[in-house]
């Protein structure tokens, strides 16, 4: 453990409760103070202030707390298995979780309250605004969503939604797919089966509005 130093270097483990700009460890770094970079073979954890985390398996940044000042989530988290942070602009891993905002997430599983770009097998959250590309997309927002299945059951979606199956409670814009469904639609559906439950025509092949 160290209360403050310019560098922590260890073959196994580093722990700090003070300001340590750089932590390098073979296995794990843990810090509760100010940290610029954490680099570890297995994992990193920062409780309050960190800018960059790189690990072989996983990274954990500060938990988002509305009433707590002085928190600095990492600008970037890079790992093979999983990244978690309250608010991280860039995350690349098999699974990524950013509780609040994220600019870019790349992984098999991506979760964010408000994301701009999500690329993965499963993406969830609100696109605000941006692009979501995956096998399954869930959430709200827009303007571009592309997947096998776009399933949006909370909030309004808008823009262009393309997939084999598009489902939205409320959609403003274009739905392009084999099966399109919307409770409320301000736009057009193009596909084999188009359902606009509250529209003039509930079900139409080809095009519905």
Where are these regions (language model features)?
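Surface-exposed, glycine- and small/polar-enriched segments that build interaction surfaces at terminal
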Residues: 1-209
């Amino acid at each position: 453990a160290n209360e403050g130093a310019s560098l922590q270097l260890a073959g196994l483990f580093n722990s700090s409760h003070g300001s340590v700009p750089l932590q390098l460890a073979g296995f794990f770094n843990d810090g509760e103070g100010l940290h610029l970079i954490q680099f570890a073979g297995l994992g990193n954890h920062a409780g309050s202030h960190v800018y960059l985390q790189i690990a072989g398996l996983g990274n954990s940044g500060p938990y988002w707390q509305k009433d707590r000042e002085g928190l600095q989530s990492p600008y970037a988290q890079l790992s093979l298995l999983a990244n978690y942070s309250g608010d991280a602009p860039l995350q690349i891993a098999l699974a990524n979780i950013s509780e609040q905002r994220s600019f870019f997430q790349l992984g098999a599983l991506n979760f964010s309250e408000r994301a701009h770009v999500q690329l993965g097998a499963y993406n969830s959250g609100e696109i605000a605004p941006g692009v979501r590309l995956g096998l399954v997309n869930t959430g709200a927002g827009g303007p571009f969503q592309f997947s096998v299945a776009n399933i949006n059951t909370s909030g309004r979606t808008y823009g262009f939604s393309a997939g084999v199956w598009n489902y939205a409670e409320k959609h403003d814009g274009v739905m392009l797919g084999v099966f399109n469904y919307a409770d409320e639609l301000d736009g057009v559906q193009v596909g084999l089966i188009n359902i606009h439950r509250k529209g003039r025509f509930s079900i139409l092949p080809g095009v519905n509005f």
